[in-house]
Design a protein with these regions (language model features):
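A bilobed periplasmic-binding-protein/Venus flytrap-type ligand-binding module shared by bacterial periplasmic
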Residues: 108-119, 223-238
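Bacterial N-terminal signal peptides that target proteins for export
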Residues: 1-12
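A conserved helix-loop-strand patch within extracytoplasmic ligand-binding domains
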Residues: 101-151
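Ligand-binding "clamshell"
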Residues: 89-101, 114-116, 188, 193, ...
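Periplasmic-binding protein-like
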Residues: 138-145, 246-267
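Beta->alpha turn/N-cap motifs
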Residues: 36, 60-64, 74, 79-88, ...
Length: 279
């Protein structure tokens, strides 16, 4: 059938539409995130990467479990909310085929209080808060140990749990909460583990006022957020284009700095340590 016929022209137009639509879908990136001060920078990067022909749909999740489930199910193409230990635990627990492909910002974690200013003011039987997921709970418990409030079993690593506490001389009562909620319980507990990013988002206190911060540099940026994809998507050019803009565009970097307002609350994990002071 000659393509000059009406049906031929219709088929040609249909094939062209499918080709264009398929190309557009290939360059449309569905990015899953959590509530974070970085979100303004993420949205800015999503606008800037349009110059490279990539459309980004940013989807925000309210918990720490759904972003990985959505990624594994193909509902999104990449997520950005978790550090390596959290990802490894999610893979172990759920069998996800997920791979980290790039570093993002590393958030400090701290012990916050609106009731005390020194750890020696903690009273016998006080209630304190930690994250309820295995990895972030361990990170918080190591802070409580550094503060001199508890002792953990020798050799306890990132997955320390309440069961690993071998000494609790002040008989602290630990409550376990989802990470994003920890910033909102400071009126109800003596101490709470929390991320400055969550404190910023909640507006409950000064994010720089933690009595103790983590020493993340010592872990080799183990707790930096990662851009994560499925294994079949590791070479996705749209992901690479977005990450390039997020990491290297000075406007995005300025948006990150403005969001945190304090360079001591975060690190740009993709940069050599010697450059971070000038971030």
């Amino acid at each position: 059938m000659p393509m000059s016929s009406p049906i031929g022209r219709l088929l040609a137009a249909t094939f062209l539409f499918i080709a264009v639509a398929g190309s557009a879908h290939a360059d449309t990136l569905r990015l899953g995130i959590n509530d974070s001060p970085q979100n303004a920078a993420i949205e800015l990067a999503a606008q800037l990467v349009k110059e490279k022909g990539v459309e980004v749909e940013v989807l925000s999740f309210s918990d720490w479990n759904t972003p990985n489930l959505a990624l594994a199910n193909g509902d999104i193409d990449v997520n950005y909310f978790q550090h390596q230990p959290f990802l490894e635990n999610a893979i172990e627990q759920n069998g996800y085929d997920l791979v980290p492909v790039a570093y993002g910002v590393e958030n400090k974690v701290g012990l916050y209080s609106k009731k005390i200013t020194r750890f020696d003011q903690v009273k016998d039987g006080d209630t304190v808060a930690v994250a309820d997921d295995p990895v972030n709970q361990g990170r918080g418990l190591h802070l409580y140990q550094r503060a001199g409030l508890i002792t953990l079993r020798d050799g306890t690593g990132p997955k320390a749990s309440l069961a690993d506490i071998t000494a609790n001389p002040r008989h602290l009562k630990f409550i376990e909460l989802p990470g994003p909620q920890l910033a909102r319980v400071l009126d109800d507990v003596t101490l709470a583990q929390s991320y400055p990013s969550h404190i910023l988002a909640a507006g409950t206190t000064d994010p720089g006022s933690a009595l103790l911060f983590s020493r993340d540099e010592e872990s080799g940026h183990l707790y930096a957020l990662r851009f994560v994809v499925t294994s079949k998507n590791v070479d996705n050019p749209a992901v690479k284009a977005f990450v390039d803009v997020f990491q290297n565009d000075p406007r995005v970097r300025a948006a990150i700095a403005q969001a945190y307002g304090n360079p001591d609350l975060y690190a740009l994990a993709w940069l050599p340590a010697r450059k971070e002071a000038s971030r």
